[in-house]
Amino acid sequence: MVVASAPGKCILFGEHAVVYGEPAVAVAIDQRVTISIKTHQKPGATWKLEGVPFIAEKHPHLEGLRKRLWHLSEQTPSLDIAINSKLPSAAGLGSSAALSVAFSAALRAARGRRVDEKGWCEGFSSELKTDPYNEPRRGHEAGFIRNGGRRLLGKDAIDEDECAILAHAIEAEVQKGRASPIDSSTVSHGGCTLLSDDFEKGLDWRYSRQLSTPEGKRNWEVHDVPVPQDDVWLVIGNTGKYSPTGKMVERVASMLAAEPERMNEIITIGSIARRGADALKKGNMEAVGICMTENHLLLRGLGVSSPELENLVKAAANYSLGVKLTGSGGGGCMITLTREPKQTAEAIELAGGRSIVTSLGTSGVRIDDDENVPFWTPGVADS
């Protein structure tokens, strides 16, 4: 059996502004999606999900990863798959990215990874020319397979970068060519991530991402933001109201088209995101909280808050260093930075929300069990 897990995430700064090239900052949270896979004896490389036959059309994230990592053939073992999620779905907490990252890690651990003494490595990476967005299969591995080479198995085969780039490719595929890499990068690497269209001074650059979208080619620079050791918590308040991200993004786009002078508010949100990242780096959590509240006021001015969100924001404010909606708005969740997590969670619950308490910047993807790997040895046709 292989067991892999990945955390959810929440956006600290930069919602909506990131669509227009401004930076956004996200942190990994304690709540995780866990995936277990094991082989079963039914022939024909079939998959079962939660004990029933796998239907690709109903699970596009899993199917996209199957195409890239587990090509079905008579030699490929059949799998039983189980999913355990501590993240609410469609709440802006990165549940789909966590699912993709955890599943990519589980499949990689189960099949292993070939490497050689010259530094060649099977798989997908920001440093390789391979394209997980458009090239699910890797034919040029044939020579290496014939010539031998060392093989990494289980947790030793896992690469956070590969998990992140595969998850972004799957998100783009499912969302018809539109997907930011902030969710996939944050839940794969853990910690805190800043995404921008440009290199940001004073932060460690991680890698670049490119994506061909219906609107043209997009480029992002992904940075690591240090998270200080401090007795401070995030409390997430879930309104229970679902609001499609696309609808809220379109609302802001329509407003900016009608009132182009309001682009100044978008630029200001970007400035707040940079100040917030700098405050995190310096360990000034009071300043982080101030930036969060300022960000919320601007998002509210853009019309993406809701009565339900405002009710929870108001309830939590007295116990918070900072408070804001997180994600696209219109519903979903709000977050508060606090040194009093119990009182804050109780205030959110009394106001009608569902509370989640988490630390900031938890660990990213990991393998929790890798017994009896590899499940099979891919041949040339399976790679």
Model-identified regions with their sequence ranges:
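Glycine/serine-rich anion-binding loops at beta->alpha junctions
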Residues: 5, 84-107, 180-181, 321-338
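C-terminal nucleotide
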Residues: 1-7, 11-13, 18-19, 26, ...
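Hydrophobic alpha-helical membrane-insertion segments
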Residues: 134-136
